[in-house]
Amino acid sequence: MAQTLAMTSQFNGRKRVRKFFGKIPEVAEMPNLIEVQKASYDQFLMIEEPKGGRPDEGLQAVFKSVFPISDFSGTAMLEFVGYQFDSPKFDVEECRQRDLTYAAPLKVILRLIVFDVDEDTGSKDIKDIKEQGVYMGDMPLMTTNGTFIVNGTERVIVSQMHRSPGVFFDHDKGKSHSSGKFLFAARVIPYRGSWLDIEFDAKDIIYARIDRRRKIPVTSLLMALGMDASDILSTFYNKVTYERDGDGWRIPYSVDRFKGMKLVSDLIDADSGEVVAEAGKKLTVRAAKALAEKGLKAVKVSEDDLLGSYLAEDIVNYQTGEIYLEAGDEIDEKTLRVLFDVNADQIDILDIDHMNIGAYIRNTLKVDKNESRQDALFDIYRVMRPGEPPTMDTAEAMFHSLFFDPERYDLSAVGRVKMNLRMDLDCPDTVRVLRQEDILAVVKMLVELRDGRGEIDDIDNLGNRRVRSVGELMENQYRIGLLRMERAIKERMSSVEIDTVMPQDLINAKPAAAAVREFFGSSQLSQFMDQTNPLSEITHKRRLSALGPGGLTRERAGFEVRDVHPTHYGRICPIETPEGPNIGLINSLATFARVNKYGFIESPYRKIIDGKVTTEVIYLSAMEESKHYVAQANSSLDAEGRLSEEFVVCRHAGEVLMAPRDHVDLMDVSPKQLVSVAAALIPFLENDDANRALMGSNMQRQAVPLVRAEAPFVGTGMESIVARDSGAAVAARRSGIVDQVDATRIVIRATEDLDPSKSGVDIYRLQKFQRSNQSTCINQRPLVHVGDRVEKGNIIADGPSTDLGDLALGRNVLVAFMPWNGYNYEDSILLSERIVADDVFTSIHIEEFEVAARDTKLGPEEITRDIPNVAEEALRNLDEAGIIYIGAEVQPGDILVGKITPKGESPMTPEEKLLRAIFGEKASDVRDTSMRMPPGAFGTVVEVRVFNRHGVEKDERAMAIEREEIERLAKDRDDEQSILDRNVYARLTDMLVGKVAVEGPKGFSKNKKLDTTIMGHYPRSQWWQFTVEDEKLQNEIEALRNQYDESKEALQRRFMDKVEKVQRGDEMPPGVMKMVKVFVAVKRKIQPGDKMAGRHGNKGVVSRILPIEDMPFLEDGTHADIVLNPLGVPSRMNVGQILETHLGWACAGMGKKIGDLVDLYQETGDILPLRQRIENLMPDDDHNEPVRQYDNESLYKLALQMRKGVSIATPVFDGAHEADINMMLEDAGLDSSGQVTLYDGRTGEPFDRPVTVGYIYMLKLHHLVDDKIHARSIGPYSLVTQQPLGGKAQFGGQRFGEMEVWALEAYGAAYTLQEMLTVKSDDVAGRTKVYEAIVRGDDTFEAGIPESFNVLVKEMRSLALNVELDDARELIAQRALSDTTEQ
């Protein structure tokens, strides 16, 4: 401990120091939060081949399972040797910019072996072997942050939860049959291959189903495995031998058989004939044992006792071979007579008592019509392939391929391990197919369950569900691709001259590459990354989905699957899951959880040995944990680390119980191991209702990064971990000294891990105003200064939503809980104008607009400034190439990129033809297809990118962008070169100074002692010419020179590569000649209609922004920033927000006190009061920063950080209690009630009673009114109904639904209603007329027939109901005419 104190006694101001309220020591370190993704994919790719070759897993296993491939005649074989990856063509940043996939070319080394086959003997000799590396497409690589870049966008592969392979026993809970009888079933689920179901029906007959096809009696399946009827009976039942004894029979006496039996007749000793127990008596276990001890060997039973039992063996006449009775026959009166006739003195009976042992297998045998193996195989063949005539060979081959062929059936290691565990088998996990013993064991277990022994499985237990992460999903996908390829290879091997071809000629890698592309592009589990803020990224990578291929569907998932299960504890978060149809199907991994090699989620526990809690940590899966008694992390311990309570609350086998302390053998590692990352960021989570905590977790992921990030006063200690692991904040890769810093990059001269092959310089490029997937702004800001020392892992730059390396999703604002003129009714939020003026909740959003110039049939489109019929005013912001300048302010309708498209030739009049013939060719017509700003969008152009196809001449703008990029690369190269020079020449100087030089550059007198002055006379490049006597030193100098030259060359090579990439044309989609992307940044201040939320599920919409002077204010004149409704708390039961408010108030009060002492120190130079105050605040324990070791400067830096408000950490389930909050309020000189007198800003009068005031952390969510507000006059219409489309994205209209129609009907507003249903909607002719009338300034129009009425008429006609419309006026006229003619 002393050592760490000495190291941290300097404070650099680059991290946020928090007062820690947790009491429980952190024993285990939290695993890296994106380990799930990285470890899984690394294991799949295994880029670096380990010593001794790659193990059979991941990509290696896929190739091994498909290769070797032989042709149909067996004359050639293609073997897999190994694979390797070349380096990726483009780095991550280049792929993002050019819309490419970040991937590395995969090269597979294959060996083609050609055989000479002897036609007579069939023996093979190797004729020829060829080996070759074959390109097999590109394999996407994972970025350091656990994402993939596919076509320029970041995507995440979400892990999938599915049912583990293995065997499951279950029953239908009495639902299938009217009697409510439980029908038991077993199901063997492989990783891939046919499912096998074995189930009881209502008559207790056991059936088997293969792949949910028609059922067959299970005995047919056993016969197909090669058993006959007597084998089956002897496998499942014991035999009891009955010997004839006078007029009755004698049977051996066994305690197990007779215990608990109620005797129907007297129990008679067969040897002595005496009655040892009387009829009607129940034999207890004790009595049964007593009889055995007295020497009872056999008992006598009457003939009647045989009735209803079953024969175990056939009764045969051995002379004639005639079978009198078959095994399994029931004994009745007739059977007894046959036994008497054939004089059978000894018979074997099946040990079935219908109580402990049922006759299910025997009854199934009797129902089964199949008698032999052939019948059974044919029956199974007919079920699997109906309509095909079976032969013995095809039936046998088909049955073998179902369960016993490793090509077709794979239990996987997990499935085998699960089967061994469930049925006490002992089979190595390399046996991945079913064996006869497995099927027998399943049937036996099922019968045991029906007999009331054993337990059914719980499919929602995490011991029976496993996680498929990226690597495994990818492995399955690649296998599909290779299998598609295999067919093509086989056909090609047969069709070509095999002696002359190379492996390259046999392989078409397209199917494999297509399978990978399809998986990353369109799989349900490959998702567009949620990049709103760092927390949403991290949560997305830790997500577990039960949906997706091979998983559940929303509609079919029941309540049980979605519910929280006791095994979720410490593995899956019980809080964080979406609201809505996906609830419970999409989950989040708990903070400390990890996935083991079998795909089961493990949680860490501390071992308890002899009652003492150790610091040894073990990870257990749900199956292993159920055997232990696990104490909670907050169980009270004594000074020696033993459990202090006599009885301890603990978990065991899914139950919570009080157990004696000597039973307890494990303890939780941390109280937050129960929840996910997002839930662990909510302070006072323990005081919030679960529903609101769920909303809080989900809403933190929607928080928009603000222009000025500010970490919360009241945190949980998780903030720095999330910022570090998400990759938002930049951490130093190696220790070193900061050499240069500007807004775009940090250059650090490494001082450790100086590998000659690596550069001694780390250049960190910072992302400046990049667009995220959700259009939020990614911007990194340096925290270090030139000359700063940084250690490996230190945070050197803040990213979006981070503040000094802490996650900062929102801002601390001064809140008052009180109603204010109804403006905070129904969760509305009242804000102060200060919030807007000081840009407290201002965020920057970056929109991307893309335009492509294509080659059309009528000619190429052109990007140009020369646009027909556009005023010069509209072109003022475009450069000569027709592309907007950076920095231009744009508004709706402004041109971003000018583009013209050739128009089709319109037919010419004879006059035009004549004129054209006289004056020559007129320029073909073009129309304006420029890209304009969409309605409602304002902003500033921040970046423009121009992409040209190979061979297309670049315009001026593209050249300028290219020059700029090359200059940037050159600066990087020069900086790295100068640091390299400085380092190398400093080392060379150290080597040479003080040594005698035998030789030197031109003009140097030999054998002179060198010093810096002498060396200073020569240029540095000539210093290498100095030669010293010491041979060893001279060799070192030579080595240094070689290394220096290599580094210089490598640097230049890297630079030239990058320049070449910049100058090269871009890959474009077919038909696209040129593409321009324009990025427009919008500054969004908070405004009424924006959604805000706290961390406790307390969400609301801003209702009004009030002038500062009208806001309620404190006694010292400080105005509240935000006013919330107190009625939003009690019914929602999220009291955490109130505790946070009080604690935040104390933090701010304490900050003020520290600020006063800082001012005092600046005036008087006396630091002692400040030191005492900070030391009193920060306890001296392992959790807190060792402020007592700080020197004065460090303490001053810390005080400056604290003066805005002291930051504290209150971990979930182990945080500050009420007493702690009271104490802190009193320390800060505030009222311990947390309430103060507030004054009304409008009148200056105090309010009637004290009001709760404090600091609360509020977030601005990504539901902004600017993105939602929308208006339309005319726009696109639906093709069929001719009604306007819906939604902002389609520029649609507002739906006037049936309820709105009722409202107008109720008002009797007939004309308004007619207008709504006709001209404003789908009366095509009518709406044109209205438009014309408005243009004319007229206000008369007539409504016609709505198009939707015509659709209705057409639909009725399709039902053979003809509807014709007649003109009413004509009808009336006709009627009148007919009336007059009649008269």
UniProtKB/Swiss-Prot annotation:
Enzyme class: transferase
GO function term, MF aspect, one: DNA binding
Keywords: DNA-directed RNA polymerase, Nucleotidyltransferase, Transcription, Transferase
InterPro entries attached to this UniProt entry: DNA-dir_RNA_pol_bsu_ext_1_sf (IPR042107), DNA-dir_RNA_pol_bsu_external_1 (IPR019462), DNA-dir_RNA_pol_su2 (IPR015712), DNA-dir_RNAP_su2_dom (IPR007120), DNA-dir_RNAP_su2_hyb_sf (IPR037033), RNA_pol_bsu_bac (IPR010243), RNA_pol_bsu_CS (IPR007121), RNA_pol_bsu_protrusion (IPR007644)
One Pfam family named in its UniProt record: RNA_pol_Rpb2_1
One GO term of the biological process aspect: DNA-templated transcription
PANTHER family in UniProt: DNA-DIRECTED RNA POLYMERASE I SUBUNIT 2 (PTHR20856)
HAMAP family: RNApol_bact_RpoB
Stated name of the protein: DNA-directed RNA polymerase subunit beta
